[in-house]
């Protein structure tokens, strides 16, 4: 079993029950899925860049990403409907717990001038989105093998009803929120 999953079952659930006074164990918010998205604007001019991004995302998450396409044509960006413009991975189960554990304990502390993640990036429905500026913070990515820096969005989808519940869940999991 994943290390983080055990921590959630033993420590986090008990703390959440006490803090919010849930009457039933099934009321406790939990992580449903983690979506890692990499939008690539340069894929319009350079389709080879998409292959490198897919390789990076595969190494980071341990799962093959799905390639995303443009929904609408935008003339200003020279974008046509159906063009490949990014990739994303949806993680659930043990792979999700392993990724979150690695992100919180290994990757985020490697970010330059890191003072914590913003506590304001909740969407009002208990989901949290985190933007990363470079893929180098992950231990699977070797500095010599990348062609350019690529950022990504990591979205934590929880079953929490409010942002406060989701913030507490992520804080107990180990997400280093910045003091504001």
UniProtKB/Swiss-Prot annotation:
This is Large ribosomal subunit protein uL5. Part of the 50S ribosomal subunit; part of the 5S rRNA/L5/L18/L25 subcomplex. Contacts the 5S rRNA and the P site tRNA. Forms a bridge to the 30S subunit in the 70S ribosome. This is one of the proteins that bind and probably mediate the attachment of the 5S RNA into the large ribosomal subunit, where it forms part of the central protuberance. In the 70S ribosome it contacts protein S13 of the 30S subunit (bridge B1b), connecting the 2 subunits; this bridge is implicated in subunit movement. Contacts the P site tRNA; the 5S rRNA and some of its associated proteins might help stabilize positioning of ribosome-bound tRNAs. GO terms for molecular function: rRNA binding; structural constituent of ribosome; tRNA binding. Keywords: Ribonucleoprotein, Ribosomal protein, RNA-binding, rRNA-binding, tRNA-binding. It holds the Pfam family Ribosomal_L5. PANTHER family: 60S RIBOSOMAL PROTEIN L11-RELATED. One of its GO terms (biological process) is translation. Gene3D superfamilies: 3.30.1440.10. One of its GO terms (cellular component) is ribosome.
């Amino acid at each position: 079993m994943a290390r983080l999953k055990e921590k959630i079952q033993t420590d986090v659930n008990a703390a959440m029950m006490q803090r919010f006074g849930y009457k039933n164990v099934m009321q406790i918010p939990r992580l449903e899925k983690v979506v890692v998205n990499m939008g690539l604007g340069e894929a319009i001019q350079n389709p080879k860049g998409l292959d490198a991004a897919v390789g990076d995302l595969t190494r980071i998450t341990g799962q093959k990403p799905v390639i995303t396409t443009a929904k609408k044509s935008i003339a200003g960006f020279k974008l046509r409907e159906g063009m490949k413009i990014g990739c994303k991975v949806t993680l659930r189960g043990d792979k999700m717990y392993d990724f979150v554990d690695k992100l919180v304990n290994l990757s985020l502390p490697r970010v330059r001038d890191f003072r914590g993640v913003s506590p304001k990036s909740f969407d009002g429905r208990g989901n949290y989105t985190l933007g990363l500026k470079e893929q180098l913070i992950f231990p699977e990515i070797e500095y010599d093998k990348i062609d350019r820096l690529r950022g990504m969005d990591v979205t934590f989808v929880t079953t929490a009803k409010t942002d406060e519940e989701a913030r507490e869940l992520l804080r107990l999991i180990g997400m280093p929120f910045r003091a504001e």
